[in-house]
Amino acid sequence: MTNLQTFELPTEVTGCAADISLGRALIQAWQKDGIFQIKTDSEQDRKTQEAMAASKQFCKEPLTFKSSCVSDLTYSGYVASGEEVTAGKPDFPEIFTVCKDLSVGDQRVKAGWPCHGPVPWPNNTYQKSMKTFMEELGLAGERLLKLTALGFELPINTFTDLTRDGWHHMRVLRFPPQTSTLSRGIGAHTDYGLLVIAAQDDVGGLYIRPPVEGEKRNRNWLPGESSAGMFEHDEPWTFVTPTPGVWTVFPGDILQFMTGGQLLSTPHKVKLNTRERFACAYFHEPNFEASAYPLFEPSANERIHYGEHFTNMFMRCYPDRITTQRINKENRLAHLEDLKKYSDTRATGS
């Protein structure tokens, strides 16, 4: 596959025949290729470029300053090259993670919910650029999820009911140039969330694995079935050619779970290039308190409580980060048990 399928989203998804047809086409593209592109307009392109420019400027700052942009309340903030690990091996991008930006006066922050707190922004320009970009990505995310529901002949708000006040977040990445001894950017993995919308510069380095007939894919949300490192050295892998005027879109683990594997979470990896590379990966997510459920097996009792899922994934990824240390020290995971009970009660109506 050399060219990804590219779609233009309607300005509004109403449930009309054209929306249903487009939704089916999106699902078919994911089932065939694992990924597709959506066209962006001039305003979206401007916001993309402003976010990339802010990222480049931040990455030029001294390491001592960048390393100060962390928090023990939230996983938002700076991640140094080599700090993140996939399948036991270090990954090499610099990352700034932007989670939900909540003031210390927010009731959830005051109550000690894990992962809740203000983003440790490096400056106002960076903050404005990233928030503006994420708002634009969020609008696209809502339309994509409505179209996906229609394509499956489900009620239009099946997914967006979960994403109301969603725990949307973004990873802003800089990859260093390759060296004679280093070519790995990020090891093969799937993403833990619902939907991924990504933007990249013109350098290139992203590879995705399309669905392969008969290939068993792990259920990454289960403790014993991590997808990290799977098939990393086994073909086929598709190079995602940098293309102006598009964002790329692929499913995460929660979509695989909710659709019973009709949509597979797309494995992907990054190789370093001869030049530094900048990219943004946006995650359009359920509400922190929401529970995802199997759509086509109504009798199934299995649930993914999003807040627990997110917290577990980040604690696993950053075991030594000050955020993880505080969660453990103050037993903040106890709040998740209470949230899960409330979520289960609402789901069963009891």
Curated annotation (Swiss-Prot):
Name of protein: 2-oxoglutarate-dependent ethylene/succinate-forming enzyme
The keyword Membrane belongs to this UniProt entry's keyword annotation: no
Residue ranges of every copy of the Fe2OG dioxygenase domain listed in the record: 166-286
Subunit structure: Monomer.
Activity response to pH changes: Optimum pH is 7.0-7.5.
UniProt cross-references to PANTHER family, sorted A to Z: 2-OXOGLUTARATE (2OG) AND FE(II)-DEPENDENT OXYGENASE SUPERFAMILY PROTEIN-RELATED (PTHR47990)
Record has Iron as a keyword: yes
Signal sequence coordinates: none
Remarks, miscellaneous: A dual-circuit mechanism has been proposed in PubMed:1445291 for the complete reaction, in which the binding of L-arginine and 2-oxoglutarate in a Schiff-base structure generates a common intermediate for the two reactions.
EC number of the protein: 1.13.12.19, 1.14.20.7
Required co-factors: Fe(2+)
Reaction catalysed by this enzyme: 2-oxoglutarate + O2 + 2 H(+) = ethene + 3 CO2 + H2O; L-arginine + 2-oxoglutarate + O2 = guanidine + L-glutamate 5-semialdehyde + succinate + CO2
Gene responsible for this protein: efe
Family: Belongs to the iron/ascorbate-dependent oxidoreductase family.
Pathway assigned in UniProt: Alkene biosynthesis; ethylene biosynthesis via 2-oxoglutarate
A GO BP entry: ethylene biosynthetic process
Organism: Pseudomonas savastanoi pv. phaseolicola (Pseudomonas syringae pv. phaseolicola)
Superkingdom field: Bacteria
Role description: Simultaneously catalyzes two reactions, namely formation of ethylene and of succinate from 2-oxoglutarate, with a molar ratio of 2:1.
Pfam families associated with the record: 2OG-FeII_Oxy, DIOX_N
Protein keywords: Dioxygenase, Ethylene biosynthesis, Iron, Metal-binding, Oxidoreductase, Plasmid
Activity control note: Activated by catalase. Inhibited by chelating reagents such as EDTA and Tiron (4,5-dihydroxy-1,3-benzene disulphonic acid), and by DTNB (5,5'-dithio-bis-2-nitrobenzoate) and hydrogen peroxide.
GO molecular function terms noted in the UniProt entry: 2-oxoglutarate oxygenase/decarboxylase (ethylene-forming) activity; dioxygenase activity; metal ion binding
